[in-house]
Amino acid sequence: MSIKTDVLIIGSGIAGLFAALKISEYADVILVTKKNKAESNTNYAQGGIASVIDPNDSFEKHVEDTLIAGAGLCDKKAVESMVKEGPDRIKDLLEIGTNFTKKGNDFDLAKEGGHSMSRILHAKDLTGKEIERALINSVEAKENIKIYENAIAIDLLTEHNISGKSESLSNNKNCWGAYILDSSNGEVLKIIAKATVIATGGLGQVYLHTTNPLIATGDGFAMAYRAGVEIGNMEFIQFHPTSFYSTKTNSESDGHSFLISEAVRGFGGLLRTKDGNLFMENYDLRKELAPRDIVARAIDNELKKRGDDFVFLDLTHKNANEIVDHFPNIYSTCLKNGIDITKQFIPVVPAAHYACGGIVVDLNGHSSLSRLYACGEVTMTGVHGANRLASNSLLEALVYAYRCANSIKEFINNSSTNIPELLDWDDSGTLTYDEKVLITQSVREVKQTMWDYVGIVRSNLRLERAERRI
């Protein structure tokens, strides 16, 4: 079955939804999402979204903080674009009804690791969920946006799929949409579009321990790679220093670790070894407020040195009412797991959290393949370099989704709409449901291998072993 549209968007996180909203102002949109429309990495983002709001803050300071965190590998122009356009994109969120937490008449701006100023807008500790709510409401109100839920993108439509041709991937020059699996009935749709946007989010589920939901399996990276699209900086996987340590199995925990937000350390949380000793002063002068990569490596080193499974995050010295007010979700979730964070230390471990690399795009979200755009975590804009600054991810997604939408408008207005005859999906050589056990076992092996050998601290020996096993 073939369906035609102006723009196909793959993914329903902040990047995909915001791009859809803006593109709908001039074109018809089909948005496909792997599960339900609210299931995305955005929905699990707790801490907030960084932007220069405080009059005492400045673009220059935010840019500098981002460049420092990125370890000299950021694209300064990309960083400056994100930072300078950030306040306008925050206004866009406010206009569609996003409710950020306030202190009096002003926004309650938090400070997180690596930031020199308080510039994190948040909605308690459920920021991503609130942004997702506002975006979904706005998108659903648009008659020219059609959402397909439980629809899994399989592969991009390129020259390789032209009827009557047998092109190699190296000859791919255009993208005309994608093959989409309707998981409710097993049918594969061919969605043909003038422009396609990949906004599929991250790949944390490639690792044994991750803060990402089950859907974050790196589909967008893989599709682009198979189509010959340029990919970059994939070695830079950010590990969040503090995910909740649980003795539950992977299935019991729904396949991902509960995130203990960066904002908890910004609020004054202290890291302690299992015997109660503070240790961050041994690693960085900023202690608990050092960037994520430094804190994650410090915790990893302490765990390996002592043979422990976790360290503690301590909030017990802070006012109990303020803790509950600032972190209602973290408080209630930990309480369900037997930890009262106002009185007890929180057991935490690092977990795979964010991909700093991805599909290489320019400042307008255009990939190396004509008609193919990308935005959000699946991309390499150059903003994050080797390490993302806390709360820059939602900002980058917003700014570059907006730029992406503007670029597509110009492209559609000025380009030919001649689309070739494209082949229907051919499932020969694929596994059937009767052989699902083979897939399940392979997934387990990959996750364990990636965690053991391609984790926080790597060596040539470990990487070579991982390559052989995979």
Predicted regions and their residues:
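Glycine- and aromatic-enriched mobile tails/lids
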Residues: 1-5, 22, 36-37, 45-50, ...
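N-terminal Rossmann-like FAD-binding beta1-loop-alpha1 element of flavoenzymes
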Residues: 7-31
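An anion/pyrophosphate-binding glycine-rich loop and adjacent beta-alpha core
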Residues: 223, 229-340, 344, 398, ...
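A glycine-rich dinucleotide-binding beta-alpha-beta segment and adjacent secondary-structure elements
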Residues: 154-174, 181, 326-379
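Glycine-rich FAD pyrophosphate-binding loop
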Residues: 24-46, 55
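Glycine-rich active-site loop/strand segments that organize a redox cofactor
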Residues: 51-82
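Short hydrophobic core segments
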Residues: 8-10, 191-200
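Conserved redox-cofactor binding core of oxidoreductases
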Residues: 95-187, 199, 244-249
